[in-house]
């Protein structure tokens, strides 16, 4: 079917894909170099990690809800990927697939409601959390 739309040799298609990809990467690097903030006295050889410069005193451990929210994001993001795969095959799955997806979404909603009621989604400090 692809031959009907784009009558091109597979090797040429690969070469075009590689050239376009390299061109996009080069364009992003050039634009980033042009529009980046230029600071006087900034040392380009010093690593910059999470907003903390090397040699500064430690700021203590990260707030625990940050990692909890990150873990919950990863979990629910994977569920979105599973639902996307179901949506692609929705016609072939029929009513049985629709019922299975509804049960799956229901379980996800119950888990989200449980986390919400439990306070896992509260970003506040220890005084505000249960």
UniProtKB/Swiss-Prot annotation:
Keywords: Cell inner membrane, Cell membrane, Membrane, NAD, Quinone, Translocase, Transmembrane, Transmembrane helix, Transport, Ubiquinone. One of its GO terms (molecular function) is NADH dehydrogenase (ubiquinone) activity. GO terms for cellular component: NADH dehydrogenase complex; plasma membrane. It is an enzyme of class 7 (translocase). It comes from the Bacteria. The chain crosses the membrane at residues 15-35, 67-87, 95-115. Belongs to the complex I subunit 3 family. NDH-1 is composed of 14 different subunits. Subunits NuoA, H, J, K, L, M, N constitute the membrane sector of the complex. This is NADH-quinone oxidoreductase subunit A. It comes from Rhodopseudomonas palustris (strain BisA53).
């Amino acid at each position: 079917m692809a031959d009907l739309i784009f009558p091109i040799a597979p090797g040429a298609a690969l070469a075009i894909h590689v050239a376009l990809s390299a061109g996009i990467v080069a364009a992003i690097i050039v634009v980033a170099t042009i529009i980046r903030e230029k600071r006087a006295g900034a040392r380009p050889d010093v690593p910059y990690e999470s907003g903390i410069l090397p040699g500064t005193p430690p700021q203590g451990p990260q707030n625990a809800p940050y990692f909890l929210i990150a873990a919950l994001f990863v979990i629910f993001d994977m569920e979105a990927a599973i639902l996307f795969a179901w949506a692609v095959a929705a016609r072939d799955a029929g009513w049985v697939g629709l019922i299975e997806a509804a049960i799956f979404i229901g379980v996800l909603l119950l888990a989200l409601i449980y986390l919400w009621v439990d306070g896992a989604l509260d970003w506040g400090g220890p005084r505000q959390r249960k």
